Amino acid sequence: MLPLSLLRTGQGHQIMVELKNGETYNGLLVNCDNWMNINLKNVIRTSKDSDKFWKIQSCYIRGNTIKYISVPDEIIDLVAEEEQTLRTTYQQRNDSNRGRGRGDGFAGRGRGDASGRGRGDNSYRGGRGGGNNNSGGGDSSPAGRGRGEYRGSSRGGRGDFRGSSRGGRGGNNNSTA
């Protein structure tokens, strides 16, 4: 657990702060920020030698002067419970039916997507490899090579716009358009 989450949970509880110069502050934690600057109220300040005591209504302690912070065990238990509930809610949120890729609730990347790379089911947009309607496939095979042609051709390779026999790898380039 992070010290900042521990301090934020400890707001409203009694803590003891020891500074690098040896002074200690016991008081009620009002608030803390990202730099571990702390506001305390109803504070008892103890000198380095523990021979002088001061009662202070409220004080501000800069985070980079802090050496040690002592918090009650109940705060540690509260932080552990909060982290567990956050973890379960985060996991439940991520367990929705989103696919890989875009995260928009649809199939995303891979074989099932109609557009983009992969196999694709739309004859206007064949992906790499084969697919239905011979889109981008090679010689009517479901797993052709190359990128395929634009509209429903059975020839593989990059090819031209519509049904041209000119193309790259894969397919049967001997037939005419």
Swiss-Prot record:
Belongs to the snRNP Sm proteins family. Residues 87-177 are annotated as: Disordered. Residues 110-122, 146-163 have a biased composition (Basic and acidic residues). One of its GO terms (biological process) is P-body assembly. GO terms for molecular function: RNA binding; U6 snRNA binding. The keyword Lipoprotein does not apply. Residues 2-75 form the Sm domain. Its main location: nucleus. This is Probable U6 snRNA-associated Sm-like protein LSm4. One of its GO terms (cellular component) is spliceosomal tri-snRNP complex. It is found in: Nucleus. It holds the Pfam family LSM. The keyword Nucleus applies. Residues 126-139 have a biased composition (Gly residues). Component of the precatalytic spliceosome (spliceosome B complex). Component of the U4/U6-U5 tri-snRNP complex, a building block of the precatalytic spliceosome (spliceosome B complex). LSM2, LSM3, LSM4, LSM5, LSM6, LSM7 and LSM8 form a heptameric, ring-shaped subcomplex (the LSM2-8 complex) that is part of the U4/U6-U5 tri-snRNP complex and the precatalytic spliceosome. Keywords: mRNA processing, mRNA splicing, Nucleus, Ribonucleoprotein, RNA-binding, Spliceosome. Plays a role in pre-mRNA splicing as component of the U4/U6-U5 tri-snRNP complex that is involved in spliceosome assembly, and as component of the precatalytic spliceosome (spliceosome B complex). The heptameric LSM2-8 complex binds specifically to the 3'-terminal U-tract of U6 snRNA.
